[in-house]
């Protein structure tokens, strides 16, 4: 028997020769892979060899390298094998490899499932550190003692000790900081993870999410091993939890063995600080998903067949590579093995691009991105626009200089293999992970919210909790509050009537310095899927989507913009008036149809953009001109303005009493006491929970009484204008009233829209129209200002001027041509009102449209 310091020889008997790391497994045997593996191990009559760890060995020699990267030494034929074999990723997580069943099955038919998120564990050799060259029979005498000595090569992970420590953690850990609101249905005085295993038995989802902070507080050494060697430790955790589970629930049959998913690693880093020391370690980073790829099938196990003798072999993937057998194991023919695709094993894979969150970005820096790879059931768990905390293993992959040459570049390409997603953001409305989706609120919290909804002034309370640092503007805050709640989405496409949007769009316009941008920022920081853009800094493709070449597949793919990323959220657009025409034109379809049609570079599709738009615009003269209409002040097309449900004006009143109250409020913000700040935080927490609960559970429908009230309100609005020849309401205004009434019913946590909701919707809509759709000449509300860009009074005056000009030209007799300036002075002399040059040119254009005259230069010719 060779000593530990001796260099093993490549020649000699089978007992002393190391087995290659990726030994193909023959399909000829009728036993399961784990049974075949034990049979191969038991065929050797050699002794257990210790790994050469002495400094006297030349580690650079080929013989030493052969040992360092070889399979574990083989045992005596009479040896009883261990309960687990770390060298194969297909067997870890199986409570006992001796259990009879189908090939690759666990306990009572629960199959074993490979974990591509961890990669292959074949390089994790089993090493007996305490062996001193004794006979194998002495080791076989105590299987228990052999298990205690098993350590994974290259680490300090003692498999038996690690497994025992994790089992003790599962059976004993009680979270001292647990709150009932966060652990609905969990007894916080009992071991937390044993109750989670009970849930797995009931629900049947074979995934156990383990908080790394809990492991650290229970066993710091176990936590250190998990962070440093996740690829080796997590399979050991899988084995431990499966043994406990199937001992506790022997009759349970799961889809596959339970997989442990650690999250909340305290080694949380900003993605721009990731460096080589993090490679192959467990990390947690946060960011926003900006792109997800299509599903990619990834081969996990290749099936090869000899073209000469039909001998078959399976080869497992090892760190993204599959070693094709060069020689047939039966007939020894070289290069005769062919890959059989339909017998190979594949797993789902998805590439995700994660971008740094704006709040984590240093000043003056552009956002960093990192590539994630999700596997199996984690595919399609997140969508573009989601803010997530990702726990995974940081990988570095070499890049070949040439695909045909094995030489690689010195710079490696990095990515993260995802182990756990957690959708969360503490500042926003509600952060959910997969455990909390179904049980967001405890019964006590729901009862508190329902009790709050019964208060008669709940509407005013919630509005005052919204942006408390901004003075007054109560109606504007109420409008934004209703926008946060939203209406009820209705889909009648199966009857041919299409879909009706539930999102409410609001435009804030007025003087500079009236808190418009602050309101937008407040809403952006509150909603879970919000996007914030500025008019000048946004392009049409930045809002919609643009085509780029995928660096992985080299194919053209669609990269989504702000409107698509804020699907089911709110898109805040500041400096709305400064957007160019091509950028604003893309909003027409989004604001009404809630979709985005794309036809670029051969990619034709329709994306969902079910987003509410909250926009802010300044007047073109830097100050609001009360003598002009809204459209004349902000120079926005009427086709776009008509799509806003509410248009509010924020004007500077220039009143001394108001200025004094405002200054007192602003100064008070600077010496706010801790009690006041804490009270505001409590109000914010209640507001978040209230809106989240209403969103997820309340879907109000119109009652008969509310339907009649809406009909009467619409008819009354039409009557107001018809008496003066004006249009004061269109069907879009009726739809806006319905959405506002539904949102107000959600504020009351009512599933039925009552007349009181319609009354508030009418009042708020009327207040907004008073400000934005009032004709400055007459002081009367005229909705046609927003829908056609011109009030009825202006239209009537334009028609009268054109008629007067026509009479003036006819009174001059049959004159073939008239001078432009002379005609302008004549009409000004006859008119009682001041006629500007623009009004005169509009009248000429109206007559030209009627084929009465034509204007050539400075000459007017009759037709």
From Swiss-Prot:
Give the matching PROSITE patterns: MCM_1, MCM_2
| Keyword tags | Acetylation, ATP-binding, Cell cycle, Chromosome, DNA replication, DNA-binding, Helicase, Hydrolase, Isopeptide bond, Nucleotide-binding, Nucleus, Phosphoprotein, Ubl conjugation
For this protein, the parts annotated as crossing the membrane are: none
Residues bearing PTM N-acetylserine: 2
* InterPro entries according to UniProt: MCM (IPR031327), MCM_4 (IPR008047), MCM_CS (IPR018525), MCM_dom (IPR001208), MCM_lid (IPR041562), MCM_N (IPR027925), MCM_OB (IPR033762), NA-bd_OB-fold (IPR012340)
**Locations listed in the record:** Nucleus; Chromosome
UniProt disease link: Immunodeficiency 54: An autosomal recessive disorder characterized by severe intra- and extrauterine growth retardation, microcephaly, decreased numbers of natural killer cells, and recurrent viral infections, most often affecting the respiratory tract and leading to respiratory failure. Affected individuals also have adrenal insufficiency requiring corticosteroid replacement therapy and may have an increased susceptibility to cancer.
Q: What does this protein do?
A: Acts as a component of the MCM2-7 complex (MCM complex) which is the replicative helicase essential for 'once per cell cycle' DNA replication initiation and elongation in eukaryotic cells. Core component of CDC45-MCM-GINS (CMG) helicase, the molecular machine that unwinds template DNA during replication, and around which the replisome is built.
Q: What else is known?
A: Early fractionation of eukaryotic MCM proteins yielded a variety of dimeric, trimeric and tetrameric complexes with unclear biological significance. Specifically a MCM467 subcomplex is shown to have in vitro helicase activity which is inhibited by the MCM2 subunit. The MCM2-7 hexamer is the proposed physiological active complex.
Subunit (UniProt):
Component of the MCM2-7 complex. The complex forms a toroidal hexameric ring with the proposed subunit order MCM2-MCM6-MCM4-MCM7-MCM3-MCM5. Component of the CMG helicase complex, a hexameric ring of related MCM2-7 subunits stabilized by CDC45 and the tetrameric GINS complex. Interacts with MCMBP.
Q: What is the recorded name of this protein?
A: DNA replication licensing factor MCM4
